[in-house]
């Protein structure tokens, strides 16, 4: 049995930055550090940070006075940001991915101009809630669509004054279909100058597609609440290959690979490499003899943490 390893896979720049913010806050200020929502959607990462003193909350009211609070990588609404700023907090750090912030700015700009905005995204996802929460113009409107059917059913105030944005972790193929429907339904709608789906999501989907073409079965390392990990598993399934979204190596049943000659392995953008290595070890225990890493797009993007958390930061008195 041979293992093919997708490339790129695992942590993206936004996830790496968010985790680093929590880790450095713990190092500098000590526990407890409060984090609004899971900083990234990965059970291993969240449990590790929790053991080190991070406390994950959903409501700002759960944070005591004089505490340190961090917003997760998914971003928050303007209302939550204002609520946090009104509290007596020692420090407030924003771990929102800069590429999510870019979409927030697009929505805020539309709100200021009075344009109605349509977001392509999954209802209930924290990134979607945060992005929708950037719009506050009562004269306009903010709408959420998930599918072409949603587009055809949508009613807006002014079809000539529309723009759209997308969640950053969507399926590239599915989103393209929704955008096509938007352009047909609303010919004058304006989209972003550059696709809102982030580079990491796009690259990992391209790598997963190649993996699915060559493997007999595909494993995606990632948690069930991870949007981008789910999209990778769906992509492999659409290619006609059995695919499994797994939190850890222990999730793998040997029967899943009993008839496979080639096993594909990839990981969502919030899954650490240690989990991938554990999966490889388990597959080797099941008889895998060779691991081949596929070629793929090189990623060298780095997002800096806030200056107060940088190792070279000095307080000016």
Swiss-Prot record:
<protein>
    <recommendedName>
        <fullName>4-hydroxy-3-methylbut-2-enyl diphosphate reductase</fullName>
        <ecNumber>1.17.7.4</ecNumber>
    </recommendedName>
</protein>
<feature type="binding site">
    <location>
        <position position="270"/>
    </location>
    <ligand>
        <name>dimethylallyl diphosphate</name>
    </ligand>
</feature>
<feature type="binding site">
    <location>
        <position position="125"/>
    </location>
    <ligand>
        <name>dimethylallyl diphosphate</name>
    </ligand>
</feature>
<keyword id="KW-0408">Iron</keyword>
<keyword id="KW-0411">Iron-sulfur</keyword>
<keyword id="KW-0414">Isoprene biosynthesis</keyword>
<dbReference type="GO" id="GO:0051745">
    <property type="term" value="F:4-hydroxy-3-methylbut-2-enyl diphosphate reductase activity"/>
</dbReference>
<feature type="binding site">
    <location>
        <position position="74"/>
    </location>
    <ligand>
        <name>(2E)-4-hydroxy-3-methylbut-2-enyl diphosphate</name>
    </ligand>
</feature>
<dbReference type="GO" id="GO:0050992">
    <property type="term" value="P:dimethylallyl diphosphate biosynthetic process"/>
</dbReference>
<comment type="function">
    <text>Catalyzes the conversion of 1-hydroxy-2-methyl-2-(E)-butenyl 4-diphosphate (HMBPP) into a mixture of isopentenyl diphosphate (IPP) and dimethylallyl diphosphate (DMAPP). Acts in the terminal step of the DOXP/MEP pathway for isoprenoid precursor biosynthesis.</text>
</comment>
<comment type="pathway">
    <text>Isoprenoid biosynthesis; dimethylallyl diphosphate biosynthesis; dimethylallyl diphosphate from (2E)-4-hydroxy-3-methylbutenyl diphosphate: step 1/1.</text>
</comment>
<feature type="binding site">
    <location>
        <position position="125"/>
    </location>
    <ligand>
        <name>isopentenyl diphosphate</name>
    </ligand>
</feature>
<dbReference type="Pfam" id="PF02401">
    <property type="entry name" value="LYTB"/>
</dbReference>
<feature type="binding site">
    <location>
        <position position="41"/>
    </location>
    <ligand>
        <name>isopentenyl diphosphate</name>
    </ligand>
</feature>
<comment type="subunit">
    <text>Homodimer.</text>
</comment>
<feature type="binding site">
    <location>
        <position position="228"/>
    </location>
    <ligand>
        <name>isopentenyl diphosphate</name>
    </ligand>
</feature>
<keyword id="KW-0004">4Fe-4S</keyword>
<feature type="binding site">
    <location>
        <position position="41"/>
    </location>
    <ligand>
        <name>dimethylallyl diphosphate</name>
    </ligand>
</feature>
<feature type="binding site">
    <location>
        <position position="227"/>
    </location>
    <ligand>
        <name>isopentenyl diphosphate</name>
    </ligand>
</feature>
<dbReference type="GO" id="GO:0016114">
    <property type="term" value="P:terpenoid biosynthetic process"/>
</dbReference>
<feature type="binding site">
    <location>
        <position position="228"/>
    </location>
    <ligand>
        <name>(2E)-4-hydroxy-3-methylbut-2-enyl diphosphate</name>
    </ligand>
</feature>
<keyword id="KW-0479">Metal-binding</keyword>
<feature type="binding site">
    <location>
        <position position="226"/>
    </location>
    <ligand>
        <name>(2E)-4-hydroxy-3-methylbut-2-enyl diphosphate</name>
    </ligand>
</feature>
<feature type="binding site">
    <location>
        <position position="226"/>
    </location>
    <ligand>
        <name>isopentenyl diphosphate</name>
    </ligand>
</feature>
<feature type="binding site">
    <location>
        <position position="125"/>
    </location>
    <ligand>
        <name>(2E)-4-hydroxy-3-methylbut-2-enyl diphosphate</name>
    </ligand>
</feature>
<feature type="binding site">
    <location>
        <position position="226"/>
    </location>
    <ligand>
        <name>dimethylallyl diphosphate</name>
    </ligand>
</feature>
<feature type="binding site">
    <location>
        <position position="228"/>
    </location>
    <ligand>
        <name>dimethylallyl diphosphate</name>
    </ligand>
</feature>
<comment type="pathway">
    <text>Isoprenoid biosynthesis; isopentenyl diphosphate biosynthesis via DXP pathway; isopentenyl diphosphate from 1-deoxy-D-xylulose 5-phosphate: step 6/6.</text>
</comment>
<feature type="binding site">
    <location>
        <position position="97"/>
    </location>
    <ligand>
        <name>[4Fe-4S] cluster</name>
    </ligand>
</feature>
<feature type="binding site">
    <location>
        <position position="227"/>
    </location>
    <ligand>
        <name>(2E)-4-hydroxy-3-methylbut-2-enyl diphosphate</name>
    </ligand>
</feature>
<dbReference type="GO" id="GO:0046872">
    <property type="term" value="F:metal ion binding"/>
</dbReference>
<feature type="binding site">
    <location>
        <position position="227"/>
    </location>
    <ligand>
        <name>dimethylallyl diphosphate</name>
    </ligand>
</feature>
<feature type="binding site">
    <location>
        <position position="198"/>
    </location>
    <ligand>
        <name>[4Fe-4S] cluster</name>
    </ligand>
</feature>
<feature type="binding site">
    <location>
        <position position="270"/>
    </location>
    <ligand>
        <name>(2E)-4-hydroxy-3-methylbut-2-enyl diphosphate</name>
    </ligand>
</feature>
<feature type="binding site">
    <location>
        <position position="74"/>
    </location>
    <ligand>
        <name>isopentenyl diphosphate</name>
    </ligand>
</feature>
<feature type="binding site">
    <location>
        <position position="168"/>
    </location>
    <ligand>
        <name>(2E)-4-hydroxy-3-methylbut-2-enyl diphosphate</name>
    </ligand>
</feature>
<feature type="binding site">
    <location>
        <position position="74"/>
    </location>
    <ligand>
        <name>dimethylallyl diphosphate</name>
    </ligand>
</feature>
<dbReference type="GO" id="GO:0051539">
    <property type="term" value="F:4 iron, 4 sulfur cluster binding"/>
</dbReference>
<feature type="binding site">
    <location>
        <position position="12"/>
    </location>
    <ligand>
        <name>[4Fe-4S] cluster</name>
    </ligand>
</feature>
<dbReference type="InterPro" id="IPR003451">
    <property type="entry name" value="LytB/IspH"/>
</dbReference>
<keyword id="KW-0560">Oxidoreductase</keyword>
<feature type="active site" description="Proton donor">
    <location>
        <position position="127"/>
    </location>
</feature>
């Amino acid at each position: 049995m041979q293992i093919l390893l997708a490339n790129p896979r695992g942590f993206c720049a936004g996830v790496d930055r968010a985790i680093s913010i929590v880790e450095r806050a713990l190092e500098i200020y000590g526990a407890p550090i409060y984090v609004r929502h899971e900083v990234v959607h990965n059970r291993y990462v969240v449990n590790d940070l929790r053991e080190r003193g991070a406390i994950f909350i959903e409501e700002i009211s759960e944070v005591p006075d004089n505490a340190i609070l961090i917003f997760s990588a998914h971003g928050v609404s303007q209302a939550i940001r204002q609520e946090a700023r009104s509290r007596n907090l020692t420090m407030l750090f924003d771990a929102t991915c800069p590429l999510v912030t870019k979409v927030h700015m697009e929505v805020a700009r539309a709100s200021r101009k009075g344009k109605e905005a349509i977001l392509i995204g999954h209802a209930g996802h924290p990134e979607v809630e945060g992005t929708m929460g950037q719009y506050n113009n009562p004269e306009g409107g903010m709408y959420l669509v998930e599918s072409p059917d949603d587009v055809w059913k949508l009613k807006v105030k002014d079809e000539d004054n529309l723009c759209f944005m997308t969640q950053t972790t969507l399926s590239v193929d599915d989103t393209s279909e929704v955008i096509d429907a938007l352009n047909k339904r609303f010919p004058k709608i304006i989209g972003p100058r550059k696709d809102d789906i982030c580079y990491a999501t796009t690259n990992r989907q391209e790598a997963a597609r190649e993996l699915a073409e060559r493997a007999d079965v595909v494993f995606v390392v990632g948690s069930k609440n991870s949007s981008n990990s789910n999209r990778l598993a769906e992509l492999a399934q659409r290619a006609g290959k059995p695919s499994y979204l797994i939190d850890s190596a222990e999730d793998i049943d040997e029967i899943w690979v009993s008839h496979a000659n080639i096993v594909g392995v990839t990981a969502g953008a919030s899954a650490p490499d240690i989990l991938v290595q554990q999966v490889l070890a388990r597959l080797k225990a099941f008889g895998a003899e060779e691991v081949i890493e596929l070629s793929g797009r090189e990623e060298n993007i780095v997002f800096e943490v806030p200056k107060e958390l940088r190792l070279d930061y000095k307080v000016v008195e």
